[in-house]
Amino acid sequence: MEKIKVFIGSGEASAVEKKLLIYYIRKNTPVEVDIYVFNGTHNSLEKNDEPPVPLNMSLRVKYKNTTEFSNYRFLIPSICNQQGRAIFVDSDTICLADIGKLFHQDMNGYDLLAKKNAYVHSGEDKWGLSVMLLDCSKCKFDIEKYWDEIEEGKYGSTDYHQLTSKFLKYHPIKVGPLDPNWNDFDHYGKDTKLIHYTNLYSQPWKAVGHKYGKLWFDYFNEARTKGFVTDEDIDKAILRSYVRRDLKNATHSSVKFHLKELVKAVKGLF
């Protein structure tokens, strides 16, 4: 049976979330998984515990990334030598189920599976590529060509990153629907297999008040207790202003901390 391969989109700004995701992929999957991490900050790839290797992405494309890793997911088939399957996952997620069930599911002849109608408010059929299952033998992405065509005005960056009909008119990739429970946007229910904290302004490690913030902190604290997420990881993220300053001692609300900060700020006015 083919070994499970999972690629995570990440960078220095999402190092804490990345480690949390890795911890729960390994915990909830009973077989060995090869985990590859795209570090968009350093244009490199990290496989399991091996040293990072540089990636062949031009600076032109790297500088077009919306997040640190937006374009890197399209390198996956070439990294896999156009063979076998691979999963891509954004780092701001927690895997709650056996990811092997996603990897080995029937793809029904599609080139890749992604979240259908991911952005329904836009009024257009757009695919959510933050979790994907790819048949690497069928997905032959030409990133440089895509950006040439974007600059020519054939379609936009959003069309490319969400595989809209404008993009697919030029590149007829066969995209099929992924079970949405494998990419549950800012929601948790009894069938959720992977929760995606996709709203950048309310992610629990950055802000107070997310409806499922307590869930994130429960998982975060377990990974800390097991030593997988370390104080050093957290201190570095705080120093770089990537996470909340109270992350070490926070609950999902940390009202006391923020009241203290408010009192200090008010006192500073007098």
Language-model segments: what does each one mean?
Residues 123-126, 187-189:
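Extracellular/periplasmic catalytic domains that process cell-envelope and extracellular macromolecules
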Residues 17, 68-69, 94:
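Short, glycine/acidic-rich beta->alpha junctions
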Residues 72-117, 124, 133-139:
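GT-A fold catalytic core of metal-dependent nucleotide-sugar glycosyltransferases
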Residues 76, 112, 129-133, 175-177, ...:
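Conserved hydrophobic/aromatic beta-strand scaffold that supports enzyme active sites
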Residues 34-78:
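Active-site-proximal specificity loops/subdomain of glycosyltransferases
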Residues 2-4, 10-15, 31, 37, ...:
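A glycosyltransferase accessory/donor-loop signature
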Residues 24-32:
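Short, acidic, metal-binding catalytic loop of nucleotide-sugar glycosyltransferases
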